[in-house]
C-alpha cells in the first residue's frame, strides 16, 4: 500500500489522446491529436501520473470485441511508452444501455458521466484527488470529474465540438496548452 498520495491526470481517450474516430478499434485508424505527445510528456514532468478513462460503447453495441479493444489499447500504450510516456493505468467502460450484447447492455456506474472509473482508480491507487486534474472532450467527461471531486477539469477542442461547455470546465486547445496552464 502506498503511503504517499499521487496526483493524477485523468484523461479521456477519444478526442484527447487520439483523433476522434467513431468506434475506433483498428490500429491503422489510430492517430494522435495535435501536440498530444509533447503535452503528455510535460504533464508527466509536472509530477502527474496518467490514467486513461474511456467509455467504449462499441463493445456493447457489437461493433468490436473486448479482444479488439484490448489489442488497440496494448498497442497505443506500448507506442506511448516507446515515445517516452508511461501510462499508469487504463480503465474502460464496455457498457451501453441500448447495446446488443446482453451482458453489457445495461446502465452502469462506470460509464461517464458517472464517476465509476475514477472511483475504481482511487480504490486501486492512493490518489490525491484534490491535486488531480481531468481532461475530456465532452461535457460527460467533465461531469464525471466534478462528481469525483476533481477541482480542475479541462475541456479540449481536439475532439467533439462542444458549443456549451459546462460552467466549471476550463476550455483549452490541446494537451500541450493544458500542460502550460497547470505548471
Curated annotation (Swiss-Prot):
It is an enzyme of class 3 (hydrolase). Keywords: Carbohydrate metabolism, Cytoplasm, Hydrolase, Metal-binding, Zinc. Its main location: cytoplasm. InterPro entries: HAD-like_sf, HAD-SF_hydro_IIIA, HAD_sf, Heptose_bisP_phosphatase, Histidinol-phos. It catalyses: D-glycero-alpha-D-manno-heptose 1,7-bisphosphate + H2O = D-glycero-alpha-D-manno-heptose 1-phosphate + phosphate. This is D-glycero-alpha-D-manno-heptose-1,7-bisphosphate 7-phosphatase. The gene is gmhB2. Zn(2+) binds at residues 93, 95, 108, 110.
